[in-house]
């Protein structure tokens, strides 16, 4: 990666994004030395313009930013770093430097899909998910049907708390069903996205 450090007197902006939630956590600046150290250690290191030295995020608090990926923009003068934060990012104690909560619950579905994929690949004994895969597609489909019925019952005659509980079970078993057929939850998301594009006229 050939970065252009000349435009800002030896610095490039580095946008830090949570690898899971995709929330923007903070913005810092790197010189070449800070960038090289970040790549070498796997922990985000900036150049402090006030202290005039390198500083690794978390060197005092322990709230390191563990690098997952580093990308340059089209002009090679700005970085997007996806990282796993070890704790609150801002020195004020908030999750982000904009005072936002670092959470995006819907993104957990991808993490859940990855977990179920791993179960399908490794098939560890004693795992409930393994037992589902071992039972075969018909049993998995039956389980999805049962969870769907339970969700409907809670929606019509149950409590809101139980509706959420049973709905979560339904989604979990649906992901298992998709995985057993070679698909992922993202495939459903793509289908919904296509349906709601500007060219989709049925809704």
Curated annotation (Swiss-Prot):
SUPFAM superfamilies: all-alpha NTP pyrophosphatases (SSF101386), HisI-like (SSF141734)
Location of region: Phosphoribosyl-ATP pyrophosphohydrolase: 109-203
Gene Ontology molecular function: ATP binding; phosphoribosyl-AMP cyclohydrolase activity; phosphoribosyl-ATP diphosphatase activity
Catalytic activities: 1-(5-phospho-beta-D-ribosyl)-ATP + H2O = 1-(5-phospho-beta-D-ribosyl)-5'-AMP + diphosphate + H(+); 1-(5-phospho-beta-D-ribosyl)-5'-AMP + H2O = 1-(5-phospho-beta-D-ribosyl)-5-[(5-phospho-beta-D-ribosylamino)methylideneamino]imidazole-4-carboxamide
Record region (Phosphoribosyl-AMP cyclohydrolase): 1-108
Subcellular location: Cytoplasm
EC assignment: 3.5.4.19, 3.6.1.31
InterPro entries, alphabetized: His_synth_HisIE, HisE, PRib-ATP_PPHydrolase-like, PRib_AMP_CycHydrolase_dom, PRib_AMP_CycHydrolase_sf
CDD domains, per database record: NTP-PPase_HisIE_like
Pathway: Amino-acid biosynthesis; L-histidine biosynthesis; L-histidine from 5-phospho-alpha-D-ribose 1-diphosphate: step 2/9; Amino-acid biosynthesis; L-histidine biosynthesis; L-histidine from 5-phospho-alpha-D-ribose 1-diphosphate: step 3/9
GO aspect biological process, one term: L-histidine biosynthetic process
Keyword entries, A-Z: Amino-acid biosynthesis, ATP-binding, Cytoplasm, Histidine biosynthesis, Hydrolase, Multifunctional enzyme, Nucleotide-binding
Superkingdom of source: Bacteria
Record bears the keyword Nucleotide-binding: yes
One Gene Ontology cellular component annotation held by this UniProt entry: cytoplasm
Pfam family, one: PRA-PH
Family: In the N-terminal section; belongs to the PRA-CH family. In the C-terminal section; belongs to the PRA-PH family.
Entry protein name: Histidine biosynthesis bifunctional protein HisIE
Provenance organism: Bacteroides thetaiotaomicron (strain ATCC 29148 / DSM 2079 / JCM 5827 / CCUG 10774 / NCTC 10582 / VPI-5482 / E50)
Lineage of source species: Bacteria, Pseudomonadati, Bacteroidota, Bacteroidia, Bacteroidales
């Amino acid at each position: 990666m050939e970065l252009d450090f000349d435009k800002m007197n030896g610095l490039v902006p580095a946008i830090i994004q949570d690898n899971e939630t995709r929330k923007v956590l903070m913005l810092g600046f790197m010189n070449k030395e800070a960038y090289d150290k970040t790549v070498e250690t796997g922990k985000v290191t900036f150049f402090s313009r006030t202290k005039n030295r390198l500083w690794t995020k978390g060197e005092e608090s322990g709230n390191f930013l563990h690098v997952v990926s580093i990308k340059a923009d089209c002009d090679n003068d700005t970085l997007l770093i996806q990282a796993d934060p070890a704790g609150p990012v801002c020195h004020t104690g908030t999750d982000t430097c904009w005072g936002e909560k670092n959470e995006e619950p819907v993104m957990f579905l991808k993490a859940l899909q990855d977990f179920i994929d791993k179960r399908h690949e490794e098939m560890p004994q004693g795992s409930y998910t393994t037992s589902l895969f071992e039972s075969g597609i018909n049993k998995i489909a039956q389980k999805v049907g049962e969870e769907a019925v339970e969700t409907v019952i809670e929606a019509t005659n149950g409590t809101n708390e139980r509706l959420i509980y049973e709905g979560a079970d339904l989604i979990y078993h649906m992901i298992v069903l998709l995985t057993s057929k070679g698909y992922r939850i993202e495939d459903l998301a793509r289908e919904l996205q296509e349906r709601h594009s500007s060219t989709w006229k049925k809704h």
